Amino acid sequence: ANDPQCLYGNVAAKF
């Protein structure tokens, strides 16, 4: 989603 929390989660998973 566009939520900041989800965004950080996606970034962590991406890296």
Curated annotation (Swiss-Prot):
Keywords: Antibiotic, Antimicrobial, Fungicide, Mitogen
Name the record gives this protein: Agrocybin
GO biological process, one term: positive regulation of mitotic nuclear division
Disulfide bonds: none
UniProt entry tagged with the keyword Plastid: no
Function: Has antifungal activity against M.arachidicola with an IC(50) of 125 uM, but not against F.oxysporum. Inhibits human immunodeficiency virus-1 (HIV-1) reverse transcriptase with an IC(50) of 60 uM. Has mitogenic activity towards murine splenocytes. Lacks antiproliferative activity towards HepG2 hepatoma cells. Has antibacterial activity against the Gram-negative bacterium P.fluorescens.
Sections of the chain in a coiled coil: none
Keyword Manganese assigned: no
